[in-house]
Structures are given as C-alpha cells and as structure tokens.
C-alpha cells in the first residue's frame, strides 16, 4: 500500500506541474503579431541562388557587350585593327574637307607667313645664322649613328644622368612656355616642333 500511495502522489504532483507549465506557456504563445515582420526581406532559398548564379553566368557568356568580354584577346585585337583601318580613310576625308572649308590651313606657308618671317629675321639682333650638327641630325641631313650617345650628353641609364636630363627638360619646358609664338598659338608651335623633328 505504501508504494501505491507514493506513485499516486508522484503522478498527482506531475499532473499539477504540467498544468501549471501549460498555463505559463499559453500566454507566451498568444503574443500580438510582430509589427516589424513585414520589414524583413524574404530570404532566398539555395535553389533560387543557384538559378540566379547560373542565369548570370549564361547571360555573361552569351551576351558579348561593348567591352568585348568573352572573346579571345587575339580576336579583340583583330577587331580593333579592322576598326582602325576603317577609320583611317574617314579621317583623311575629314582633313580634306576641313582644308577645303578653310578651317585648317594647308601645311605649306602662305605668302603672308613668309613675309612676316622675313621681316622678323631682319628686325632680329642676330647677325649670322650657323646651322649646327645637332640641327642637321634633326632635319635628317647629318648621318645618324644608332645606339651611339654623344660624349657630353648625360646618360639616362644612371641616376645622375637621369637627374641631369630631368633638369634640362624642365628648363626647356619653361623656355617653351615663355616663348611668344607658343603663347600666341600653341598648336602651330607644336606642329612646327614636330615638323622639325621629322
């Protein structure tokens, strides 16, 4: 009998505790709906992620954009070369039409330009003009030895020579900026300098 009573008491106690637990849990489950529930974006499933990735990859492969992605480098080079070759005649036509319209003057100096240069040379204080060997090498009349440096010219391959060349270039740059012809018309001065070097 005693054992029977003990189990009965235990079951009664267990029932009471479970009922109390159920009453305690019920108010927690009956909370009002969360006001921020709709602010969270729906999560992507793994399947959707894989589909999106594959779609992006396929579209990248099939769609060749303006930057020519997805094409081999040699093919891109060939296409660019073809476009350049097609553009050259168009640029020549543009140059001819601009010269005909009078927007760009021809490279030959006109009579007015020759007269202005002659007058400037008469007014200058220089009495005798001597062409140097360096000028001849620029014009192409003097023989040029490729790979041979002048003895007094600084060598760009070592640090001291590179520094000296940088100083010379900065000095020459300032002289060009202070030049009156460059200040009046910089593009004509650049054209003339390029013409002298060819």
UniProtKB/Swiss-Prot annotation:
Keyword annotations: Nucleus, Ribosome biogenesis, rRNA processing
In residue numbers, the region (Disordered) covers 28-49, 137-163
Q: Name one GO biological process term.
A: maturation of SSU-rRNA from tricistronic rRNA transcript (SSU-rRNA, 5.8S rRNA, LSU-rRNA)
Mind telling me which GO cellular component terms the entry cites?
90S preribosome; nucleolus; preribosome, small subunit precursor
Report any Pfam family annotated for this entry: SLX9
Q: How does it assemble?
A: Interacts with the 35S, 23S and 20S pre-rRNAs and with the U3 snoRNA.
Q: Output this protein's name.
A: Ribosome biogenesis protein SLX9
